[in-house]
């Protein structure tokens, strides 16, 4: 999985192609003696693109751990539509798949199973965890999900083209 990701990360216009919704984060209110956990949220569906987004998040988290003393945590969010029972039945398998990918990185991962609309639930988890970014398996800023995340509390990152 990392070989295609590595080749994409050597682009000169990487920031332009991955930042889908730019936002400036407001500084948190963590106490100076307390090491604030750095969090990243990944929208995960089990698709190849969402796996690549999780891989990218785990890579960013790994690099962040090397550069900062703070704990770093990746939050994988799988959202089920209660009107589609098949998505509920697949939830455990899909979140297990995410945990397996994280174990390859030896990264810290929290899995979240939510019921509702994807954009609303991703924004909610990002807000609750005071996330640095939401990562998606999208390539374009005009993707319907990206458009719905325009009010997200943090930047939304996609995959490099």
What role is predicted for each listed range?
Residues 30-89:
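Small/aliphatic-rich secondary-structure junction motif
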Residues 57, 98, 122:
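Aromatic/hydrophobic pocket-lining residues that form π-stacking "cages" and hydrophobic walls in ligand
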Residues 103-110:
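A short helix-to-beta-strand connector/capping loop
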Residues 113-121:
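Charged docking surfaces used in two-component/phosphorelay signaling
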């Amino acid at each position: 999985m990392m070989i295609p990701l590595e080749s994409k990360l050597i682009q000169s216009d990487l920031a332009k192609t991955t930042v889908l919704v730019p936002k400036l984060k407001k500084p948190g209110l963590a106490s100076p003696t307390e090491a604030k956990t750095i969090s990243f949220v990944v929208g995960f569906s089990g698709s190849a693109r969402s796996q690549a987004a999780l891989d990218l998040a785990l890579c960013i988290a790994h690099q962040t751990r090397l550069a900062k003393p703070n704990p770093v945590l990746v939050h994988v969010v799988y959202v089920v539509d209660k009107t589609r029972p098949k998505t509920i039945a697949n939830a455990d398998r899909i979140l297990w798949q995410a945990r397996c990918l994280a174990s390859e990185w030896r990264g810290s991962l929290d899995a979240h199973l939510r019921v509702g609309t994807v954009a609303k639930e991703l924004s909610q988890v990002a807000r609750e965890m005071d996330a640095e970014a939401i990562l998606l398996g999208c390539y374009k800023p005009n993707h319907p999900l990206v458009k719905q995340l325009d009010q997200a509390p943090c930047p939304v990152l996609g995959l490099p083209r």
